[in-house]
Amino acid sequence: MSDLYTIDPMLAKDAHVDRAHYKTLYHESLEQPEAFWSNIAQRLEWFKTPTKIKDVSYQLEDVHIRWFEDGELNASVNCLDRHLTLRGDKTALLFEPDAPDAPSSRITYRELYERVCQLGNALRHLNIEKGDRVTIYLPMIPDAVVAILACARIGAIHSVVFGGFAPNSIADRINDCGSKLIITADEGLRGGRKIPLKANVDAALKIHGTQSVETVLVVRHTGGTINMHTPRDRWFHHVVDIQATECAPERMNAEDPLFILYTSGSTGKPKGVLHTTGGYLVYTSYTHETVFDLRENDIYWCTADIGWITGHSYIVYGPLANGATVLLFEGVPHYPTVSRFWEVIDKHHVTLFYTAPTAIRALMREGDTPVKKTSRKSLRLLGSVGEPINPEAWHWYYTIVGNGRCPIVDTWWQTETGGILITPLIGATDLKPGSVTLPFFGIRPALVDTNGQILDGPAAGNLVLLDSWPGQMRTVYGDHQRFIDTYFRTYPNTYFTGDGCRRDADGYYWITGRVDDVINISGHRIGTAEIESTLVAHPKVAEAAVVGFPHPIKGQGIYAYVTLITGETPSEALHQELLTWVRKEIGAIATPDHVQWAPNLPKTRSGKIMRRILRKIAENAPDQLGDTSTLADPSIVDLLLNERLTH
C-alpha cells in the first residue's frame, strides 16, 4: 500500500486550483488578507458592496471578529434569486425518501424560490420579524431547506435542532435563544422507523423556560396521528399554500446573525454557536466550489443531517449559493440493505459524495460485495468529514467505493469554523491516507505545546489558528464571555480548536482527536459534562464520570463510570434503566456504550476527578496510567482496572 497518492495530471489540468495556483493564492491570502477576501466576496450578490473587509481582535479584553461589516446582502437571494435567469429550471434539490420504493422528487430553483417566498410571507403574517429566533426540528425533507432559507429571507435567525434529540434537549435550545416559533413535522422516517417529532415538541413545550414559543407550524409528512393544540399549532400547508410566491428579501448587514447552532461544550450546557451572514456565505460558497471542484452538471450528495453544521454549510448554503444540484437523502446507509448508499449514487448519477468515516467503517465491515454489485461509475470525487478517518477505511473508500479513480478530500473543520479549514484540493495536493493535508486559503494553523509555545517543523501538539477567516463564529449566543473563555483564554492571541494534531516532515496535518472534555461520536460532538449531569440527575446515582474510548465503527464511544447512592446495588435492570434515562433526556446519540459500576472514582486530594486515568482504564491501557501519586485513594484505580479487565 502506497502511503502517498500523487495528483492525477488529468485531474490537475481541469481542476479549479492546481499546485502552483494553490501556492500563489495561499501566500496572497496570508500576506494580503483584505485584498484576497475582498476579491473572493465578489462571488456573492450584494445590495451594498463591502469596503471594510476585516476587523479582528483576539485580545482577551476585546475579542471581536468582523468581516465585510459595511456590506449588505441577503443569503436567500444568493441561494435562489440570482440563479433564476440562467438556472431557474435547473434541479436544486433531488429528494430521495427513506423507503426505496417511495418516489423520489425534483425541485427546481424556481420552485424552491417560490416555496421559500411563500413560507417567508407566512412567517411575516405570524409576526416573525428580523432578529426573531425560529427553531426548526424537521426530518431530512425539502421543507427543511425551505424553512432555513425562508428564515434567511426575512432576517429571522434559525436554530435547527437535530431530529434525534429528545424533548429536554429541544427545550434547552428553545430556552437559550427564546424562539418565537417552531417548525416541525408530524413524524420523521429513518430506516423504516417513525420518529415522533411533533410529540417531542409537545413534550419540550411543557418544560419550564419554553414559554417564548407562540406558534408551532407542523408539516404533514407521514400522515401519522398527532395532537394539535389550538391556537398554538397550525398545519404548515394551510398557512403556507395560500401565500404569494414573491417575498421581498430583508436587507441584512454582513454581520447580522444568520443562525444559531448548538454544539456540545465541555461545561455541560450546549453553547449556541452564532454565525453571521456575509462572511459565512462567502466562505461556505468558496470552499464548496473549490474543495469539491464543482462543475455545472455535478450531482452533489452530502449525507449529513441538516441538524449539524455540515448540513447547514454543505447541503444548504454553500451548494445552493453556487447553483449546484443537491441530493437530499432522508434515509440511512443500511436500510433496507447495506447497498443503499451505492444504489442511490447509481440511481441519481451522483458525481460528488461527502460522508463520514463512521458510515465508511460500518459499510466496510459488510464486505466489498454490497458495493461491487453497483456501478458507481458516475462518481468523480469522494469526501470525508466529521472525524479523523483511519488509513484502513481511507484505502477501502478509495479502492472499493471509488474504484481507485476518485480522489478523496479528507476535510477538517468544526461547527465553530463555519466551513472547511484544512483539506486537500484535488488538482493541487498529493494525498496521504489519514491526513487532512494542508490548510485552505487564509487559514494559518499552528501547533502549540501545553505552555502555548509554538512548535516548528514536524511536531505533535494542540491545534490553534493564528488568524481569522470569514466563516468563523462570532460569539456564543447571549454569552460572549463563554466564547472568550472557551476559545481564546487557553492560548492567548490564538483560536484554540480543542483538537490534538501532528504535523509531518512534509507539513501535512494529522488530526489526533479531542483534547478537551468533548467526545466525537460518529462525527457528532457530545460534551461529557452533559451526559454526566444527566446520569447524576437519576435518583439512584450519586456520582458519574464519562470519557471517550476508541470505537471501531463510531470513532469514539461513550464509557460511563457510575457510583450509586448508598443502599442501591448494581443490576442489569438498573443498567438498562440508566441507558433509557440518558436516551430520554438527551437523545439516542448520547447513550453510553459501556456503564461500569464504580464504588468510588479516582480523585485528587482537592476532589477533582482524574479523567485522564479514567480514559486510560476505558481504553484498557493500564501501562499508560502515568502518575497516580496525587490521588486521594490510589487503590480505587486497581479496583476499576480489575472490573474493566473482566468485561
Swiss-Prot record:
Listed Gene3D superfamilies: 3.30.300.30, N-terminal domain of ligase-like (3.40.50.12780)
Binding site for ATP: G386, E387, P388, D410, T411, W412, W413, Q414, T415, D499, R514, R525
N6-acetyllysine modification, residue list: K608
Post-translational modification: Acetylated. Deacetylation by the SIR2-homolog deacetylase activates the enzyme.
Keywords of this entry: Acetylation, ATP-binding, Ligase, Magnesium, Metal-binding, Nucleotide-binding
Domain of life: Bacteria
Protein name: Acetyl-coenzyme A synthetase
Native organism: Xylella fastidiosa (strain 9a5c)
Gene that this sequence comes from: acsA
